[in-house]
From Swiss-Prot:
Organism in which the protein naturally occurs: Gillichthys mirabilis
Protein name in the entry: Thymosin beta
Basic and acidic residues: compositionally biased ranges: 1-17, 33-44
A GO molecular function held by the record: actin monomer binding
Source lineage: Eukaryota, Metazoa, Chordata, Craniata, Vertebrata
Family note: Belongs to the thymosin beta family.
Low complexity composition-biased segments: 19-32
Length: 44
């Protein structure tokens, strides 16, 4: 087996077969301010 990967399949890949997807917003981490607010019990 050689060190180089087999790229034959990648080179012949047809991009038109891919489906268009919509990207959803990922859950972002809370800011330091939000964390401090929740720690102090000011979430209500």
């Amino acid at each position: 087996m050689s060190d180089k990967p087999d790229v034959k399949e990648v080179e012949s890949f047809d991009k038109t077969t891919l489906k268009k997807t919509t990207t959803n917003e990922k859950n972002t981490l809370p800011t330091k301010e939000v964390i401090e607010q929740e720690k102090s019990g000011g979430s209500d």
